[in-house]
A protein has these predicted regions:
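Conserved structured catalytic cores and adjacent interaction surfaces
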Residues: 586
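Short hydrophobic beta-strand motif reused across regulatory alpha/beta modules
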Residues: 187, 499-506, 565-573
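Bateman (tandem CBS) regulatory domains
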Residues: 440, 451-464, 470-473, 505, ...
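Alpha-helical transmembrane segments and immediately membrane-proximal extracytoplasmic
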Residues: 1-452, 456-457, 461-462, 467-478, ...
């Protein structure tokens, strides 16, 4: 592209040397990734501090055996007690599983969130998980990264869809740094946070942020994978592939059970008529009592996952732990503990795979791999079935193993597990509450825009009414004088609408002069009128237009009060939608310019 002398004038030099929009997005994405990587280090440092300050010395006492074992419940209870001051200082921001609320803020409210929740989330999750309660840190670190991305968006004064993308970029960076898996971080943000609705330009932001966060994490921790998975191979593909497919079905079934128990237990705790500060303590006590017999359920369970992957799991113990970990996670988060479900899902998947693999290997030792291989595939498959995010699970496992041979089994089990779980329950573990609230965050951007526009802002308030007692000839005169409207509300003596009349209604009597003179508008009008209120949205209006094949709809004060306040025209709805799309496009474009 040639630049003229005019372009080189002082007034144009500033803009000439400014980076393009895509370059600015990459710069901001890099910044988000670096900060997300640092946040991951801070998060893990605080978690390790709590763990070594409370859990390690406490468990050392309990490990002496005898009556000391009965003191184990005090360890997880101590963490919940320490949450109380935080909950009092910051009501509504400490207790419970918060990822569903996070998804609502990202996909419905544009990703705007409070910065202080970063610190609160780090502390509350560290106290919950670091003292042995059953939860994971991956969901919270995604929220922390997302909140940081949102904060950076505010600093650069971006708005609209850009804030949402930067929030997702922070999530990608947080997860990538946690697992040392940049590709999985990208798809976590794309599949789980953005629910699969993103543009190509947004995808590049996720990639850059995830990569930079991984660089920071590897610089600090090294290139050590989250789980050192042994060398994997298919002993006999023809025999093992069907076995993995069966395991995929099993993963889907258990995932549905997991989701059901998770929300059932939470609902039971919410129904308890006691102080919210007491509920997490009760939950922690239950965890501690269970851990006396099965300590593997405590915390994120990563140590036991490593044992299972190494093939050291005992069949009956792993089988019991499937249900105990499901219950323990539901109790911890359902009672008000702070944390995520990512790590528990990995734990449950590993013990399902480990126990299943032990059984099939004992039955067919010459054609199957060891139980550790099935546990490794189970890690990702159960995560996929629980979150309905198979691509994230596939890449996560691939990056953790670095073995391309694992791709085929993990693809099959993840897709089958997700398909089974989705068939039995349309919601993932993160979207159940949204469905209960009748919020559909899977809908596209177009529908979201239409639902944001109220009918009251689009209606034509100047309406020509016609009395139900008027004769048809008078109506025809009105039609002849009409310029752009051929739908007229029919009103009674009180002024309330009793029907609507259109050209379609009078076509049948146009050539019957006698009937035209004797019939009234009330005789031929449509009585069963489809109406809207000013508070309805234009998405509902367009649905009505399409179903009935009409061009105008009367707008009344309320369904009970048929007092017409205006008419809504299909073309006005389309114009309003186009204006809003243009407005959002200009807003996002302007926001990107402000980065300079």
């Amino acid at each position: 592209m040639l630049h003229t002398e005019e372009d080189m004038k002082p007034g144009h030099l500033k803009t000439f040397f400014l980076p393009g929009e895509n370059t600015r997005m990459v710069i901001v994405a890099s910044l988000i990734g670096v900060i997300a990587g640092v946040a991951n280090i801070c998060f893990r440092t605080v978690l390790e501090f709590v763990h070594h300050s409370i859990f390690v010395p406490g468990y050392a006492i309990v490990s002496q055996g005898g009556w000391y074992t009965l003191l184990l419940p005090l360890i997880p209870v101590s963490g919940m007690v320490l949450l109380i001051p935080l909950a009092i200082l910051f009501p509504g921001e400490i207790y419970g599983y918060g990822f569903t609320k996070f998804l609502r803020k990202v996909n419905i409210r544009g990703g705007s969130m409070k910065f202080r929740k970063n610190i609160l989330k780090i502390i509350s999750c560290s106290l919950t998980i670091g003292t042995g309660n059953s939860a994971g840190v991956e969901g919270p670190i995604a929220q922390v990264g997302g909140a940081l991305g949102s904060a950076i968006g505010k600093i650069f004064k971006v708005s609209g869809n850009r804030t949402k993308v930067y929030t997702a970029a922070g999530c990608a960076g947080g997860v990538a740094a946690m697992f040392n898996a940049p590709i999985a971080g990208v798809f976590f943000a794309a599949e789980i946070v953005l629910l699969g609705t993103y543009e190509i330009s947004s995808f590049s932001v996720l990639v850059v942020s995830s990569a930079m966060a991984t660089v920071v994490s590897r610089s600090y921790y090294g290139e050590i994978p989250a789980f050192p998975i042994p060398e994997f191979h298919l002993v006999n593909p023809l025999a093992e592939i069907p076995l993995y497919m069966i395991m995929g079905v099993l993963m889907g079934l258990v995932a549905v059970l997991h989701i059901y128990i998770f929300y059932e237990v939470r609902d039971r705790f919410e129904a308890l008529n006691i102080s919210q500060h007491v509920k997490p303590i009760i939950g922690a006590f239950i965890i501690g009592c269970t851990a006396i017999f099965f300590p593997q359920i405590m915390g994120d369970g990563y140590h036991y996952i490593k044992d299972v992957l190494a093939g050291h799991g005992v069949i009956w113990v792993m089988a019991i732990l499937i249900f105990l970990k499901i219950f323990a996670t539901a109790v911890t988060l359902g009672s008000g503990g702070s944390g995520g479900v990512f790590a528990p899902a990995l734990f449950i998947g590993s013990v399902i795979g480990g126990s299943y693999g032990s059984i099939v290997h004992n039955l067919f030792p010459s054609v199957t791999a060891s139980s550790g291989a099935y546990a490794a595939v189970g890690l990702g498959a159960f995560l996929a079935a629980t979150t309905h995010a198979p691509i994230t699970a596939i890449f996560l496992l691939f990056e953790m193993t670095g073995n391309h041979l694992i791709i085929i089994p993990i693809m099959l089990t993840s897709i089958i597990g997700t398909a089974v779980a989705s068939k039995l329950n349309a919601d993932s573990i993160d979207t159940v509450d949204l469905t209960r609230e009748r919020i559909d965050i899977h809908e596209g951007r177009e529908i979201a825009i239409m639902k944001s526009i109220r009918v009251g802002k689009v209606i034509t308030e100047e309406v020509d009414f016609i009395s139900e007692k008027a004769n048809v000839d008078h109506l025809l005169e009105i039609f002849q004088m009409a310029k752009d409207s051929f739908y007229f509300p029919v009103i009674d003596e009180t002024g309330h609408m009793v029907g609507i009349i259109s050209l379609q209604d009078v076509k049948g009597i146009l050539h019957d002069k006698e009937l035209r003179l004797s019939a009234t508008v009330g005789d031929i009008c449509t009585r069963n009128v489809l109406t809207l209120t000013p508070d309805d949205n234009i998405y509902t209006a367009m649905t009505y237009f399409d179903v009935r094949g009409i061009a105008e709809i009367p707008v009344v004060e309320s369904p009970e009060d048929q007092w017409v306040v205006g008419m809504l025209k299909r073309r006005d709805v389309i114009d309003a939608y186009n204006r809003e799309v243009l407005k959002k496009g200009i807003s996002e474009r302007s926001a990107s310019i402000k980065l300079t």
